[in-house]
Amino acid sequence: MSIAIETGLIIASIIGKHTDKMIEGLVNNTEGKTACKNWKTDDWGGYERVLSEEINHEIGKENTQRLERINGIVRQQTGRWHRRQNKFAKEWEETERISKLVISYYNWIWENSRLGTKAAERAELTDKKWDWHDSATYPTIF
């Protein structure tokens, strides 16, 4: 998962095992959405193999709590939404689709109880309060 730390906006997400191919997909998906050249990651060696030389790569636990909290919210909501859909499909692609819906919900509809704002508002992508109807009629899924 690729997150803008200042706003909490989820920029990109890839579902799968930790492989170089997965990291390449995450990097490619993130690069098209932001000009950020600073990556803070864990100590997994795949990042060093995949990230280009122009990217400032820092290894550390800084901001880990925020990333893990967002990851936990997305995992919990994906599990809830997926259980409601199990009678229709038990495929990996279904989990991926539901995860994209959950991330869209998190970015545009879910309001942070402490800050009182949504990630898209903090990133200045909108000044409007979004609801399910807005999300369904406007393409927000990445």
Q: Where are the model-predicted features located?
A:
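Residue-level recognition of single "structural anchor" positions
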Residues: 1-142
